[in-house]
Amino acid sequence: MLTDTHCHLYYEELFKDLAGVLDRAHEQGVNRFICVGTNIQDSKKSLSITDNHENIFASTGIHPHDAKDVSESFIDDIYNLMEYDSMVAIGEIGLDYFRNISDPEIQKE
């Protein structure tokens, strides 16, 4: 049994055929999923998908490109989302120096 630890099942092209996406993944031996939120809105979408699928879990975070936009209320929202049992990880997070959209020091902070 494999787990896809980084998917975005809320993307419109995937979500509109979610049953088919999951079926094709199952055929390849992928039976669990962590749907990664890149901001609060997408994290909530990930969480809502978990309501109907016991094998889908969610994560919450901020994409490194948007690190410059993090506020105290954003951090509070992250903590609130982590209260849900199906929210199992923090991520999308990391350091992205390739595109350099957010200052590296802000990403580290």
Feature roles, as predicted:
Residues 1-109:
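Mid-domain alpha/beta scaffold segments of enzyme catalytic cores
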